[in-house]
């Protein structure tokens, strides 16, 4: 066997008959499988041991030779080689076909490769191959055309006319094989190249296609006649197994049936040929053989599929590879693993951030080999078998050993669906009683887990390296930031938020107000003994607090705070300021001076003069976490998060907040507000009946009236709410619920959407406290049901989008430090109309500059060229009034097969510069796909019938962008740079004409009458600018402008969709995806290169080909950039393994085989498929050959011969 981690590339070609014979260990002559009495394989049958190897290890068929000592001997009685039974997975056989047979992939695929090679139509080929017509192979002196078809009758007539042997015509695959042998590739290619110089239209397209196929044959060294099979390989028997079921019946792979049919027909054909049977009978048998081989290779591709029992189509070789259940996706890309388990999850509020609770009975099973090794080492048992029995009996001593074994041995927890890399994280196991896995509450957000019955899977990394990687790269405590936007993903929620909110509340006039304490302990003691309330404002000596970054003017003073805030600040990292107010100024600049007593001031007066601060809400906690991370990185942050969690749980328990129906307030003036609205609606309807407004206007006015009524109720609700009301506290703190939920409980439910998406005029006037009437209930259930179905559909769509995104970008890896490009991307804030969707500051953070940035007024250099822009630097640049900056970007990176560190910038998940080997393509795909489920599914209708453009938004728009489809509601763009000189309306054709005057000429654009104009007369427009509202078609923009403009446009469009839904995604992720869509060019004129016109190729390969020609003084080729959708881009990737495992498996493999494609295994997917370590992170080639050195030699435990189990060797 080849060492799987050492080889460089993998090639696929057509197999020549001699190649197939060299693979084979013998010919399969009989259709038999196994003997029904002995259940042993039949001789010369499909499971023959002589051909494929023994069924039992080191044992021949007749039993003469048993045991390993006869290794390699061929038995003289039965002819079976004594070897491992595993060879039955790799030894192939063959069938000598008595008539040539065409390979259906090459004849039936689109485009038909056989047809293009011979310049015949697939229809004509089919007639010949399936014996419906003769084809003229050599007309000799007759006036017949070569390759022309003759029916049976015409053939007989021509024979009579010209005499026997005057010309050669045949039928069947044999005829095609003769024709293919006669193809002279070199002359044909030369002729086609000549023809291309003059050909146009359909002729040119066909010539380019033929040239492509012929050139592929010529360059790869494949011979066209190998598309016809004379010998059929038989795959190893263990890959088409036959197993005995409980009832004595057998279950066999469908392939055996298909092979049996081929063998039966082949043998019958051989017999007919021996008997010199009449031509028509032989012909019919040959046709049946052809159909049998077709069914074996791809059942159902031509005609009706061959069916098994219960009219189920049999699974052929092609079906074994295709689709989700095929070899690629089922077994190569998704394997099941041992040392894994799954269970329901429960909350583990006492765990540390890096821990998870594992039930004892799960742990003992998962860590069994480690425990057994330790039992033997401590001599509790003499050998492995005895140790195993100890574990199975549940001996008391194993639990102590288990405790030691799991110490510092991380496990991986995974929750499906794994939408991004935070769906699998590593934890240190803690043994617990019970049967549920315990999960730390703060990692729930990353997993999107809750405890309503979710299940999670647990995996054990076995090798030292795997454990080290789990600990260093995947430990949950390290994953504070979300890779998609660099914001903390572990913000506390629910009870934790509520507890800290309650803790930091302030209240006037509570017991103990105005007391002064010497230090924290005294204050807490007073609180515990009931002398002072948690929310009372008291004084404390500043000097008793540890270094909290006090200003010099604040030292040695008394500070006004509350006992709750003293406790809250006690868990903060020491170097954060004392947090008194929930705002960024206090967090970054220090505690405000107004809370400190000047000498001689009365504390009560100071307290009375201070306003009551609002408590710390979820958002404020998020800011504190982000600031902590910025200053202290992961270790301190995760410790702080644990303290925050414990404090929150403790105080939300102490607060004892409960919710009852009495907590829902009654709005005093609800009846008046609703009465007024009814009155207004009546007036609107009156006006409509009198013909003063259209039905559309009336509808809009009525719905607006009810909307305003609901808002008035909401406003009144907010005005009258009691800040100590538990529901209000939950809502205000961000623990659960929002104002809209609250107003449905206490105000009114408001307007509902009807099944057709239109908003109904009848609002639901009741709220949930009053209760809904039956009709109101009916109206509201519709919305709830629609929500459920939408979510279900959206999840599937979003998952498929993620799969396509991962596929197109999986080979984008950080390959080098700096690509040295001189290009950059000019960026400014992304705007949508007047609104800013993404500010310049956000776009600059974590990127490298391309040129130095100067202050627009003073000219001072703010930051040099090729420098990393930090968060503070970005703010400084924007504050200076800079509006656009040229940065290094993935779009302009010159690295082949990936990106360089400088063009990418920082890794958002760590906040540091990205490392070489980071798989940024996969991260980008996950970052864009994961929030997909949060996007809406709908197409918005603009109110009224005023416009006919529906703006696609949400998930459908994202798919439209990434698949480069023509958008709905397409905008008209100008191809001329100049001034809009006139917009004329033509009522007869219901269109408008826009005239743009440029330097070189005038552009005239016809626009639909109903389209909303974006430009006015006198506006200056650039090439590619939109004249009307709507989405620009990117392919059209590419024709008018350059690649960079298209890339910038697509980036802005993606950001608009996500940001409008409140989802933030780093620009660089979108850049990675968009760059993959534009990495190919189409060759227009080959010049002096040997490129073919019309071929798609990588920009880098195209540039290389041109460089060579220019150096030798030739004419370089010209090309045009091509924008491909992500599905097309995945299928056009240089790796045939990756493309074949994605979609259209047979088409990809057919094409790759003819071209003799080489896969250089640069991406992640192709390496996973062949079981090689992936070329990212520690798997990069540069780290591949490092051998771990053992520091202390470990004794190897030998094992008694008597046991049947292999010894477990200590790592």
Curated annotation (Swiss-Prot):
The keyword Nucleotide-binding does not apply. CDD domains: RNAP_beta'_C, RNAP_beta'_N. Binds 1 Mg(2+) ion per subunit. The keyword Transferase applies. Zn(2+) 2 binds at residues 819, 893, 900, 903. Its cofactor is Mg(2+); Zn(2+). SUPFAM superfamilies: beta and beta-prime subunits of DNA dependent RNA-polymerase. Mg(2+) binds at residues 450, 452, 454. It is an enzyme of class 2 (transferase). One of its GO terms (cellular component) is DNA-directed RNA polymerase complex. Keywords: DNA-directed RNA polymerase, Magnesium, Metal-binding, Nucleotidyltransferase, Transcription, Transferase, Zinc. Disulfide bonds: none annotated. Gene3D superfamilies: 1.10.132.30, 1.10.150.390, 1.10.1790.20, 1.10.40.90, 2.40.40.20, 2.40.50.100, RNA polymerase II, clamp domain (4.10.860.120), RNA polymerase Rpb1, domain 3 (1.10.274.100). Zn(2+) 1 binds at residues 60, 62, 75, 78. The RNAP catalytic core consists of 2 alpha, 1 beta, 1 beta' and 1 omega subunit. When a sigma factor is associated with the core the holoenzyme is formed, which can initiate transcription. Belongs to the RNA polymerase beta' chain family. HAMAP family: RNApol_bact_RpoC. DNA-dependent RNA polymerase catalyzes the transcription of DNA into RNA using the four ribonucleoside triphosphates as substrates. This is DNA-directed RNA polymerase subunit beta'. The gene is rpoC.
């Amino acid at each position: 066997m080849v060492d799987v981690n050492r080889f460089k590339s993998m090639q696929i070609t057509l197999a020549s008959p001699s190649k197939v014979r060299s693979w084979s260990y013998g010919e399969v002559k009989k259709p038999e499988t196994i003997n029904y009495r002995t259940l042993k394989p039949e001789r010369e049958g499909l499971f023959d041991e002589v051909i494929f190897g023994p069924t039992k290890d080191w044992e021949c068929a007749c039993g003469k030779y048993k045991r390993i000592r006869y290794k390699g001997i061929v038995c003289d009685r039965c002819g079976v080689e004594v070897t491992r039974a595993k060879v039955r997975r790799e030894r192939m056989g063959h069938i000598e076909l008595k008539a040539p047979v065409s390979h259906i992939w090459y004849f039936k695929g689109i485009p038909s490769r056989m047809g293009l090679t011979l310049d015949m139509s697939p229809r004509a080929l089919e007639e010949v191959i399936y014996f419906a017509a003769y084809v003229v192979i050599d007309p000799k002196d007759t006036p017949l055309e070569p390759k022309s078809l003759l029916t049976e009758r015409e053939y007989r007539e021509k024979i009579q006319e010209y005499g026997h042997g005057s010309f050669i015509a045949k039928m069947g695959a044999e005829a095609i094989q003769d024709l293919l042998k006669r193809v002279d590739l070199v002359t044909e290619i030369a002729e086609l190249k000549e023809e291309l110089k003059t050909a146009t239209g359909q002729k040119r397209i066909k010539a380019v296609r033929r040239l492509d196929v012929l050139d592929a044959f010529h360059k790869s060294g494949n011979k066209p006649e190998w598309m016809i099979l004379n010998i059929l390989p038989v795959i190893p028997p263990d890959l088409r197994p036959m197993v005995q079921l409980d009832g004595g019946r057998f279950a066999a792979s469908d392939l055996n049936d298909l092979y049996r049919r081929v063998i039966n027909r082949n043998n019958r054909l051989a017999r007919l040929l021996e008997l010199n049977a009449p031509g028509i009978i032989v012909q019919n048998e040959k046709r049946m053989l052809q159909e049998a081989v077709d069914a074996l290779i791809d059942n159902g591709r031509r005609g009706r599929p061959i069916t098994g029992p219960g009219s189920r189509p049999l699974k052929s070789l092609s079906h074994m590879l295709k689709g989700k259940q095929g070899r690629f996706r089922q077994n190569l890309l998704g394997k099941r693993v041992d040392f894994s388990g799954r269970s329901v999850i429960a909350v583990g509020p006492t765990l540390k951030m890096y821990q998870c609770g594992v039930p004892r009975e799960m742990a003992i099973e998962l860590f069994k080999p480690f425990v057994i090794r330790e039992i033997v080492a401590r001599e509790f048992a003499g050998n492995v078998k005895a140790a195993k029995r100890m574990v199975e009996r549940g001996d008391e001593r194993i639990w102590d050993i288990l405790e030691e074994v799991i110490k510092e041995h991380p496990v991986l927890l995974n929750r499906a669906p794994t939408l991004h890399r935070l769906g699998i994280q590593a934890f240190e196991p803690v043994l617990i009683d019970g049967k549920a896995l315990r999960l730390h509450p703060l990692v729930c957000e990353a997993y999107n887990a809750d405890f309503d019955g979710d299940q999670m899977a647990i995996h054990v990394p076995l090798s030292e390296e795997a454990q080290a990687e789990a600990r260093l790269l995947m430990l949950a405590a390290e994953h504070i930031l979300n890779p998609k936007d660099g914001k903390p993903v572990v913000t506390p929620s629910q009870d934790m938020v509520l507890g800290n909110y309650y803790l930091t509340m302030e209240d006037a006039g509570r017991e103990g107000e105005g007391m002064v304490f010497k230090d924290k302990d005294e204050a807490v003691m007073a609180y515990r003994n009931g002398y002072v309330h948690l929310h009372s404002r008291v004084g404390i000596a500043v000097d008793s607090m540890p270094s909290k970054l006090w200003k010099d003017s604040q030292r040695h003073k008394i500070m006004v705070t509350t006992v709750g805030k003293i406790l809250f600040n006690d868990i903060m990292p020491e170097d954060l300021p004392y947090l008194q107010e929930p705002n960024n100024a206090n967090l970054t600049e220090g505690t405000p001076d107004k809370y400190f007593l000047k000498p001689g001031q009365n504390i009560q007066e100071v307290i009375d003069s201070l306003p009551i601060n609002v408590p710390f809400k979820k958002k404020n906690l998020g800011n504190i976490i982000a600031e902590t991370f910025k200053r202290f990185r992961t270790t301190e942050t995760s410790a702080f998060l644990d303290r925050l969690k414990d404090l929150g749980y403790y105080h939300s328990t102490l607060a004892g907040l409960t919710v009852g129906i009495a907590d829902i307030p009654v709005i005093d003036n609800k009846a008046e507000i609703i009465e007024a609205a009814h009155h207004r609606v009546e007036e609107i309807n009156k006006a409509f009946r009198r013909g003063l407004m259209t039905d559309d206007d009336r509808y809009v006015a009525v719905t607006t009236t009810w909307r305003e009524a609901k808002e008035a109720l909401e406003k009144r609700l907010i005005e009258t709410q009691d800040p100590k009301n538990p529901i209000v506290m939950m809502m205000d703190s961000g623990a659960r619920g929002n104002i809209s939920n609250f107003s449905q409980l206490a105000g009114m439910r408001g307007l509902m959407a009807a099944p057709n998406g239109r908003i109904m005029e009848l609002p639901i006037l009741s709220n949930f406290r009053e209760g809904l009437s039956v009709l109101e209930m009916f109206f509201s259930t519709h919305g709830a049901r629609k929500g459920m179905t939408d979510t279900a559909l959206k999840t599937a769509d979003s998952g498929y989008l993620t799969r396509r995104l991962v596929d197109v970008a999986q080979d984008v890896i950080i390959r080098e430090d700096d690509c040295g490009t001189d290009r950059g991307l000019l960026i400014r804030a992304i705007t949508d109309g007047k609104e800013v969707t993404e500010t310049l500051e956000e776009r600059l953070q974590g990127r490298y500059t391309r040129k130095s940035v100067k202050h627009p007024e003073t000219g001072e250099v703010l930051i040099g060229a090729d420098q990393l822009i930090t968060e503070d630097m970005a703010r400084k640049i924007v504050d200076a009034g800079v509006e656009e900056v040229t940065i290094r970007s993935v779009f302009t990176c010159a690295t082949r097969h990936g990106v360089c560190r400088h063009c990418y910038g920082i890794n958002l998940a760590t906040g540091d510069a990205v490392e070489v080997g980071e798989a940024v393509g996969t991260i980008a795909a996950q970052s864009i796909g994961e929030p997909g489920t949060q996007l809406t599914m709908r197409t918005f209708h603009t109110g009224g019938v005023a416009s006919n453009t529906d703006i696609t938004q949400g998930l459908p728009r994202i798919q439209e962008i990434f698949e480069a489809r023509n958008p709905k509601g397409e905008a008209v763009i100008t191809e001329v740079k100049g001034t809009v000189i006139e917009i004329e309306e033509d009522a007869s054709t219901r269109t408008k004409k826009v005239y743009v005057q440029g330097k070189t000429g005038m552009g005239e654009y016809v626009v639909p009458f109903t389209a909303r104009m974006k430009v006015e007369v006198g506006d200056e427009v650039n090439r590619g600018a939109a004249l009307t509202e709507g989405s620009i078609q990117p392919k059209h923009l590419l024709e008018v402008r350059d690649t960079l403009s298209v890339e910038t446009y697509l980036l802005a469009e993606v950001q608009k969709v996500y940001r409008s839904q409140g989802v933030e995604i780093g620009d660089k992720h979108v850049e990675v995806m968009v760059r993959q869509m534009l990495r190919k060019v189409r060759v227009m004129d080959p010049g002096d290169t040997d490129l073919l016109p019309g071929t798609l190729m990588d920009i880098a390969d195209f540039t290389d080909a041109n460089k060579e020609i220019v150096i030798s003084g030739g004419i370089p080729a010209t090309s045009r950039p091509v924008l491909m959708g992500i599905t097309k881009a995945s299928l056009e990737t240089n790796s045939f393994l990756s493309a074949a495992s994605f979609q259209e498996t047979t088409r990809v493999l057919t094409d790759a085989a003819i071209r003799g494609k080489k896969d250089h295994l640069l991406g992640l997917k192709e390496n996973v498929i062949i079981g090689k370590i992936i070329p990212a992170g520690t798997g990069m080639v540069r780290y591949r050959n490092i051998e771990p050195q053992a520091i202390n030699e470990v004794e190897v435990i030998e094992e008694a011969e008597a046991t049947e189990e292999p010894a477990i060797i200590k790592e």
